[in-house]
Amino acid sequence: MIKFEDKTVFFTSQPIVFNFEVGDVIETPELVIVRLNIPADNQTRQNVFALKKDGKFVWQVESSLKKYPEINVELPYENMTLLEDNKLIVSDFFGRTFDVNVTNGKLLNFKVTR
């Protein structure tokens, strides 16, 4: 099990330090998916990353505003869940949920849940 504290995720080979506090970590057989807590006054939006089990970077989540310009405002993700079928779901403050391809971080679709 991968451990994390503050801005650091502890891999067997080395600790990885991010610019922001780690909010969630989800492990799959191949990847460690990390969601960062972004302060309200910061413009960072793509706050979900995947790393290999040795800590090597794999992907950063695709920009929702570039993929879906109709959403008008891009926010950092506040929650993430990995479903049994290996589907990653992330959601933002506006109640929008996005399906993320776990292999490459691309957004597959979105819906509003509020």
What do the PLM-derived regions correspond to, one by one?
Residues 1-114:
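Secretory-pathway ectodomains
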